[in-house]
Amino acid sequence: MSVVKAMWDHASVDVWIYLQLIIFLSVFYFFYLFKDNIKIIYFILSLNGPPALPFLGNINYIFDKHLLFKMSHFAYQLYGPVFRIWLTIFPFVVILEPEDIQKVLGNPRHVSKGFLYNLLHNFLGKGLLTSDSETWKSHRKIIQPAFHLNVLDKFIESFNHSARKLVESFLSAGDCTNITYLVNDCVYEVLNETIIGNERQPGSKLLNSKDSPFRQGQISLFYRLSHPWLIFNYFYKKTEMGKREDKHYEALFKACKNKINETKQPNDDKNKNKKTSLLEFMVKIKSTYPEFREQDIIDECCTFMLAGQDSVGSTIAMTLFMFAKYPRWQNICVEEMNEIFGNDSRDPTLKDLRDMKNLEMFIKETMRLHPSVPLIGRVLGEDIKIGKHIIPKGCSVLIFPQSTHRLSHHYLNPHEFDPEHFNPDRSVRRHPYAYLAFSAGPRNCIGNKFALLEMKSIISKVLRHCQLELVPGKEKVVTKFRVTVRAKGGIFIKIIPRIQSHNS
């Protein structure tokens, strides 16, 4: 019996040593596996930032209707140029100073966007906006030629055609007009032709597109963040919202797939001046890049159609509102149109649009105070030094253009609307990363020239035919925070036919 007990005791010691070894190795492996995350958490805890709730972090800020105001007016003063926030259990470093932002956005090692953008895959697909760094590099190289200036020149006729329809809609809408829906219809019609390649609708009415999958769907990003278990697709796809999103993406896929099949059909049209939509361009170039799949074409079309509508539409509507609010600048820009066109009622050319310097200053100032994209995210590909801080590799960084655009040491009277901020004499002395309306660096908005030409074409057409005034009782626009910034309840303007000395 004593022999058995001795053997048992010896075995117990061996088992105990074995268990200790397993525990030690497990702990060691855990720390090895998550050493970067532990380093990040340790760094995050050393930073200043707004008070955070356990497990929820600062997610409640996302639903604060005054968030944009607080971020633009008080964040820098309260927390400085570098601080931390928590979105549920996920930490982020916020940087506001342009020279620090340049170290992130201007460095090709930091082009990865991180998990926040992954939550948009179900809605936008994996296009240039949301894709990982390697996919982005490949797609950007392939798509870039489609946005060269000589290609964009052929799209200006499409911009002008839809702009004429928008003016007709404005003039027939009455004194108090919610311009938001009409502007969105106009932008959609432009994108429907230039991105997808659908034929324009004849007549003077804007395209009725309420049933299009490109005008439907709901972005669930912030809802999922406020319900952390829904960050995981396994759980999210079992919810009603997840099922609706999947159904919506199926409709988007089908619409793009049908157009791709149509584009592949033989075409005898040899007109060299014919516009080539982005979808047609990608279908043609696919044979040169075998790694560029049909699914990639669909994802890119979804990205440009869905993201382009929100950003361009909201900016045009806000710019028109600002013209109503600042009649002196409205007169300045109308006079600029008169100098360019004289008594000629023709549509603008590329040269005309590029000559609209005052209009461009006005649009840029609108986008400075009201950027359509409220945040830019990156994941660091290596450690970087910002001020006294060494921010570790793998850390998620957020940039808030709304805050950076209102730094008093970069903009005189930063909270005041003043298009002279973009007078070339002032702009040349300003840090290039102090203005982020189209992001900046290698992963900036590929369609920024397209968007600016589209906006100038549409807005100039409106100014030449319409006098814009504020509607009593609707002199303020309340913005709401989404993936893009939108006007809550719409934007209302009084539209009066402009008296002209020439045939319009």
For each feature predicted by the language model, list its residue ranges.
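Cytochrome P450 heme-thiolate "Cys pocket" and heme-binding signature region
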Residues: 124, 307, 425-455, 478-482
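Conserved cytochrome P450 K-helix E-x-x-R motif and the immediately C-terminal K′/meander segment
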Residues: 59-80, 254, 258, 347-387
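Cytochrome P450
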Residues: 2-27, 86-93, 150-161, 171-193, ...
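Cytochrome P450 heme-binding "Cys pocket" and the immediately downstream C-terminal segment
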Residues: 201, 327-329, 448-485
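Conserved cytochrome P450 catalytic core segment spanning the I/J/K helices
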Residues: 60, 148-150, 188, 225, ...
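N-terminal membrane-proximal hinge/A-helix region immediately C-terminal to the signal-anchor transmembrane segment
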Residues: 2-138, 153, 157-168, 382, ...
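Conserved cytochrome P450 K-helix/beta-meander segment immediately N-terminal to the heme-binding cysteine loop
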Residues: 110, 399-426
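Central I-helix of cytochrome P450 enzymes
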Residues: 187, 191, 249-256, 285-339, ...
